[in-house]
Structures are given as C-alpha cells and as structure tokens.
Amino acid sequence: MQLTAVGLNHQTAPLSIREKLAFAAEHLPDAVHALAHSPAADEAVILSTCNRTELYCVGDTERIIEWLAEYHNLPIEEIRPYLYTLDNNETIRHAFRVACGLDSMVLGEPQILGQIKDAVRIAQEQESINSHLNALFQKTFSVAKEIRTDTAVGENSVSMASASVKMAEQIFPDIADLNVLFIGAGEMIELVATYFAAKNPKLDRKSTRLNSSHLKLS
C-alpha cells in the first residue's frame, strides 16, 4: 500500500465522462467508507466536483481503478483512457496544486479549497482517513493558506459561478433585460443562480434537464 491518487478532470475527460464518474453528495459518505474498507485501500478521501473526481488513497492503484469502475458500473476499459494516476510525491504535489487553485479551470478560484476540506471532513466522519492522509491534507491546507496569503494567486480570482456572470456581461449589454434559464441540480448551479439573481434579470428559471420547450425562441 502506498500514497496514491486516481482521478480525472476537465483537462483529461469530457463532461459526459466526468458526469459518469462523479459521486453525488448524498452518496459520498457511503462511497468513501466502502473504498477505505475494501481491499483496494486502507485510507481514502474522495473529492468530487463538477470539474474533477479524485480519489486520494493509501492503497493499490490498480485496485482503486477497478473499484471506481465497479462502483459506477462501468467497464474499466471505458474509463481508463481518461484517468491519471499519481504516486507518493506526485500525489503530494498535485494536492497542493489543486488546493491552491492552480489546477482549476479558473486559475486561483477559491471554492476548491472548501470542497477539499469538506471531502476530508466526510472521510474523517466515516473513519476512512488515518495518519498518512491526515498528514497530507493538514500540510495541503497550510500550503494553500500560505500561497493565497503571500502570493498573487487568487488576488483577482473568481469562482466558476462568478466567472459565468462576468462572461455574460461581456456578451449582453444588460443582464437585467434577460430571461435566464439554469439547467442542472447541485451546488454549482445554485451558486450560478445566486450570482445571476444579484443582477436582477427579468426572469430566472431552473430545470434539472433540457427539453424541447427550452429550445423554443420567443
């Protein structure tokens, strides 16, 4: 058993694959408990966001990949091309980069650090984390705090949610004149809706799926 990470993100996999390998928030506690108490791993933290799914473990890399495929009921050959695997020092460096927002779609975005802290807390509650991963993530949080405090990383950073509003403002003269439809369900779409609501659009609606009625132009 060694320190390892298995994952995929917006750089390695299209949205369709990322969605298949994501862990719903309500299922994450049971999933991380199952992984850490399986033959694949002795310790585990599962980070699952809209742009990445990463399994930080003390375990066997190949068995972790097999567990991931089996958990999501997918052929291992279907997911393997999109995965990256990291060992020991590579895992440590990667955790630092992710926590600092250096591996994010929006450079320096602050939301990811809170998401990692939530993932670690869930793993602790499920008794799925021990000395190795505790040490890794305590150091990760310390490094992220230092980087964000002492460097320009994150100085002008924005979350994906606020970035979507900024992009809309560059395209449309006034968001207050728009009808806005939000498609999806989860933390990110809630944040996007909150940012747009602050701009007082004429109408905002939410839908968990796209259907033909949404495609009609008025």
Residues covered by each model-derived region:
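Short glycine-/acidic-enriched loop or helix-start segments at secondary-structure transitions
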Residues: 56, 192, 218
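A glycine-rich (often HGG/GG-containing) alpha/beta subdomain
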Residues: 1-104
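Glycine/serine-rich phosphate-binding loop and adjoining beta1-alpha1 elements at the start
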Residues: 78-176
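Alpha-helical elements of the RecA-like P-loop NTPase motor core of helicases
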Residues: 66, 114, 190
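Glycine-rich phosphate/diphosphate-binding loop of Rossmann-like nucleotide-binding domains
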Residues: 168-209
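Single conserved hydrophobic/aromatic residue that forms the stacking wall/gate
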Residues: 206, 210-218
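Active-site-adjacent beta-strand anchor residues
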Residues: 58, 85, 154, 182, ...
